[in-house]
Amino acid sequence: MELDTKDRQLLSLLESDAKAPAHELAQATGIPPSTVHHRITRLEQQGVIERYAAQLDPKQVGRGFAAFIMVTGSPEKYLDDDFFEHDYVAEVAAVTGSYDLVIKIECPGLQEFNEFLQQFREKYGKYVSQTVTMVCTETLVH
């Protein structure tokens, strides 16, 4: 599907605020509100917009501590639903380079992170040759 300039503008605005009213989107893009509505509906139907989600403040919901676990090995072949559905697992990405996976953990604090890491090593350690942990000190862009 080919996206034109107005589609890209709408998508950028919706990424910033998915609840922005059509009249604000119309004003920002210079197209009528009814056209905004039709374009958004088309983008949804074509799968460009997959879903709308709330961006939560991690501190407010008990996930003020964030860390990244860089993994070498092949645990992705053995990770199960328990892992992917764990409350602390925010993101998992297969990557190229020195590591095979990057796991983003968001949890209440250091103690909970250490407990999670210990459980991860116990359950998946035999599939992992190395982990490197980086604690997030500040989120610069969300």
Where do the protein language model's features map onto the residues?
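A compositional/biophysical signature of low hydrophobicity enriched in polar/charged and small residues
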Residues: 1-142
